């Protein structure tokens, strides 16, 4: 059966730029999936997604004009129950009637268990035109569109008004109706550079015709690559690098159909404003690409992506420079105005900034942050006064003009203003870095003072918000407590602080009775659960569970313990020792009395005497290794007692009739368990 390329295009008004690429990929994949299910393609679909500001399209190779005929087998009642006294039962008659067949037309097939009556027939394949309309409509309905709109007098809804529909199979129009539009082969090109309607000659010629006749690069990926290449070439010529992330590049790609990269500049005096402010306004407000010199300093030149190609782009460049000049003038004004007041003098205004109506204002919060940060700094051996001062100033920039205009600059502007106020560099850096880490993979604060303030900030958020009952549930975490917990854990893995003690200190900083009394224990459990999630990114679940079963309060040696358990698990004795440890723990649960010291005089059998001697020899070795942080050595020592453990369980009845002997054997197993679990609960390995 011959096949041809299928093309579908929805011509729209300007689509949301941040959603464009996702919409295009979903639309193309959904159409391809529908064709596969309809058996209009053999094997996996080979398709290309197109997405530009005014169109979503997909081009799919090797699409059949008609489905292949199919042999259909409808299975009915079992042969054993279908005939009675040589006549068909009601069940068989009903099956034949439902299948539209006569009894004599039925065949007998085996369904894997028994012989059954069946009706076999050939179903003629449907043409593409009969199936495609529903496939397209279903694909449109399944698009990830948070908000839809209506247009004109129609009742149809879509993310933006749709004005045209192309459906071509090879060079032939496939007649379908979608969103109130009848399919055709005509579309529009670039809004300004194209000369009117374009007739697509063939599904395979779409991209070339759009580029040549319509001045549209229809492929999102192709436009993005072209922009990236042009940006790099222009920056290279200026010995600069482009300051931009993937999100900005994607957004700009979604805003243009025929990209042209141009170079522009702004007055040097604006460079007196912190470069973070200038970069943010260029990227966020204007979608420009700032340039950094070889020292990472902002240059007074930038790159922009135009949607127009002209012989003389000077008017485009000048227009963009004029718009940016106004933006930068605003930033310069805010910066100068903010310098008229110190951070310290701004603190009273924080009393009017509500943090949460149940736990007070930012001013009240600062009081807590100061005490928590000073406590943590002392524990870290850092300058407690510097940490307290940084915590006092940490939120002062929230009431500045610049942060009011650009909330993303909170902390950053605090650093600059702290420097201007004569604060030490350590304090200024801590003011900025106390928000770190902001997200997974973000840098940790640099230095102990900054770490103390960052820990205080996140602990106060976690304990305070949790304590008033705003606990994360499912995918709802409006106060980002999970992110705060992960940030705390990442920092604590660098420093030897007691996590439970920090939680209690933070809880005690709130007015008595304000927070739920269970908050310390609940947040500690929450942190433990988040820690498991964090560690399972790098280690198997059973190894993480073994280490965390000990409920470690210090996290700075976690990595060493995890690596040690991973190495222990590879030992030939590991599986047997893990099983023995589990058996020991189960026996210890049956103890009637409090477990204590082993009484050598009550050791009766050679196997228990040998195990006691081995445990006695093992204890100082493991204690010394753990004290020195040599966890792998501590665990590897366990391999030496495997013969004695095996012999003990093979030859000794732990739950002896004599209560004293039984208790003594349980005491022996308890001593063994303490040594086996000194680093981790090895019983859970392999579970």
List where the protein language model places each region.
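Amphipathic alpha-helical "coupling" segments that flank catalytic cores
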Residues: 1-687
């Amino acid at each position: 059966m011959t096949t041809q390329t299928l093309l579908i295009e929805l011509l729209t008004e300007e689509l949301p730029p941040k959603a464009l690429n996702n919409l295009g990929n979903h639309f193309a994949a959904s159409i391809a999936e529908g064709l596969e299910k309809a058996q209009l393609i053999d094997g996996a679909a080979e398709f290309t997604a197109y997405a530009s500001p005014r169109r979503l399209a997909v081009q799919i190779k090797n699409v059949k004009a008609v489905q292949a005929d199919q042999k259909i087998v409808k299975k009915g009642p079992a042969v054993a129950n279908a005939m009675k006294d040589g006549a068909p039962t009601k069940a068989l008659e009903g099956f034949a009637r439902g299948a539209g067949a006569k009894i004599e037309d039925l065949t007998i097939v085996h369904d894997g268990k028994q012989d059954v009556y069946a009706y076999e027939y050939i179903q003629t394949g449907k043409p593409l035109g009969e199936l495609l309309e529903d496939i397209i409509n279903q694909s449109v309905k399944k698009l990830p569109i948070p908000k839809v709109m209506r247009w004109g007098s129609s009742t149809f809804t879509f993310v933006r008004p749709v004005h045209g529909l192309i459906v071509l199979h090879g060079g032939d129009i496939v007649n379908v109706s979608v969103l109130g539009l009848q399919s055709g082969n005509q579309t529009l090109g670039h809004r300004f550079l194209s000369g009117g309607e374009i007739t697509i000659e063939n599904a395979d010629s779409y991209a070339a015709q759009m580029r040549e006749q319509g001045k549209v690069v229809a492929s999102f990926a192709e436009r993005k690559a072209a922009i990236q290449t042009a940006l790099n070439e222009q920056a290279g010529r200026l010995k600069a690098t482009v300051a931009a992330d993937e999100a900005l590049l994607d957004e700009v790609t979604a805003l243009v159909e025929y990209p042209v990269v141009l170079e522009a500049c702004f007055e040097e005096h604006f460079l007196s404003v912190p470069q973070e402010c200038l970069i943010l306004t260029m990227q966020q407000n204007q979608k420009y690409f700032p340039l950094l010199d070889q020292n990472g300093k902002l240059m007074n030149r930038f790159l922009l992506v135009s949607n127009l190609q002209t012989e003389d782009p000077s008017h485009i460049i000048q227009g963009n420079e004029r718009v940016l000049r106004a933006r930068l003038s605003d930033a310069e004004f805010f910066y100068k105005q903010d310098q008229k007041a110190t951070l310290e003098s701004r603190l009273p205004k924080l009393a009017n900034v509500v943090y949460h109506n149940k736990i007070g204002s930012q001013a009240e919060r600062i009081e807590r942050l100061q005490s928590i940060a000073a406590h943590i700094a002392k524990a870290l051996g850092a300058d407690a006064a510097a940490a307290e001062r940084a915590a006092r100033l940490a939120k002062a920039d929230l009431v500045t003009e610049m942060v009011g205009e650009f909330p993303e600059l909170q902390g950053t502007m605090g650093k600059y203003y702290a420097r201007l106020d004569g604060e030490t560099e350590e304090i200024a850096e801590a003011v900025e870095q106390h928000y770190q880490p902001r997200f997974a993979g973000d840098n940790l604060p640099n230095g102990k003072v900054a770490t103390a303030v960052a820990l205080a900030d996140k602990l106060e958020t976690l304990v305070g918000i949790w304590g008033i009952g705003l606990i994360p549930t499912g995918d709802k975490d409006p106060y980002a407590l999970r992110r705060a917990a992960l940030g705390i854990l990442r920092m604590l893995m660098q420093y030897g602080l007691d996590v439970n003690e920090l939680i209690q200190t933070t809880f005690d900083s709130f007015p008595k009775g304000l927070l739920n009394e269970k908050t310390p224990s609940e947040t500690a459990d929450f942190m433990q659960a988040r820690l498991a999630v964090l560690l399972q990114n790098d280690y198997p679940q059973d190894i993480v569970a073994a280490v965390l079963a000990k409920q470690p309060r210090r996290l700075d040696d976690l990595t060493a313990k995890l690596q040690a358990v991973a190495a222990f698990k590879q030992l030939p004795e590991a599986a047997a020792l893990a099983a023995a440890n589990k058996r020991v723990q189960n026996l210890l649960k049956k103890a009637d009395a409090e477990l204590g010291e082993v009484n050598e005089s009550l050791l009766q059998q050679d196997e228990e005497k040998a195990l006691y001697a081995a445990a006695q020899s093992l204890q100082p070795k493991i204690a010394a290794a753990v004290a020195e942080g040599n966890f792998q050595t501590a665990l590897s020592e366990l391999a030496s007692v495997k013969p004695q453990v095996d012999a003990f369980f093979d030859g000794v009845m732990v739950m002896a009739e004599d209560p004293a002997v039984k208790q003594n054997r349980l005491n022996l197993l308890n001593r063994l368990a303490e040594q086996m679990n000194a680093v981790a609960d090895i019983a859970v390995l392999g579970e």
